[in-house]
Swiss-Prot record:
One of its GO terms (cellular component) is small ribosomal subunit. This is Small ribosomal subunit protein uS4. It comes from the Bacteria. Residues 98-161 form the S4 RNA-binding domain. The lineage of its organism: Bacteria, Bacillati, Bacillota, Clostridia, Thermoanaerobacterales. HAMAP family: Ribosomal_uS4_B. Part of the 30S ribosomal subunit. Contacts protein S5. The interaction surface between S4 and S5 is involved in control of translational fidelity.
Length: 206
């Protein structure tokens, strides 16, 4: 299945939470979820009792949409998380958080992960002084993520940084230098996403 190309706000309404897919609009009262906090469609306002499988599937879909990844990619992340030491669900979240496009978003260079993915793919981002144009690239502690010098004059990036969004504790931002550093690996408490990752583990453990 290809990448979803429909209205982004429908996905937020489907999952019942803000997925921050539309950038700046998501931080304002114009967000459709604030006006219509129910699922889209003719029966969207009806309360439906989900089965256990339905709940597991809903959590997986929520996580995939939050990070903007496809099923095949998601399965690869899950399989890698299973092989790591520790709790599989938390390992999965850590891997997704370490994606370069997510880090570019978290540092405030972009207002959405989709925009961050474009900045990376178009060669505007460097890791440790070298261009990296792979959105799925996994960062590690000590890595320095920066905007390429020739791209620092872009109004888009400057305006995004001026918004002054909070940066998670596992990252640090030097706004004046257009760069951020990975201080540590992200832990569960750093990830402000209301997802029940244990349900995803149950789904794939069947």
């Amino acid at each position: 299945m290809g990448r979803y190309l429909g209205p982004s706000c429908r996905l937020c309404r489907r999952e019942g939470i803000k997925l921050y897919l539309k950038g700046e609009k998501c931080y304002t009262d114009k967000c459709p979820l604030a006006k219509r906090g129910y699922a889209p469609g003719q029966h969207g306002q009806e309360k439906k009792k989900l089965t256990q499988y339905g709940m597991q599937l809903r959590e997986k879909q929520k996580l995939k949409r939050y990070y903007g990844i496809l099923e095949r990619q998601f399965v690869r992340y899950y399989e890698r998380a299973e092989r790591m030491r520790g709790i599989t669900g938390e390992n999965l979240l850590q891997l997704l958080e370490r994606r370069l496009d997510n880090v570019v978003y978290r540092l405030g260079f972009a207002v959405s992960r989709a925009q961050a993915r474009q900045l990376v793919s178009h060669g505007h981002i460097e890791v440790n002084g070298k261009k990296v144009d792979i959105p799925s690239y996994l960062v590690k502690p000590g890595d320095v993520i920066s905007v390429k010098e020739s791209s620092r004059s872009m109004e888009l990036i400057k305006n995004n940084l001026e918004m002054g969004r909070n940066v998670p504790d596992w990252l640090e931002l030097n706004k004046d230098a257009f760069e951020g550093r990975v201080v540590s690996l992200p832990r569960r408490e750093h990830i402000d996403l209301p997802v029940q990752e244990h349900l995803i583990v149950e789904l794939y453990s069947k």
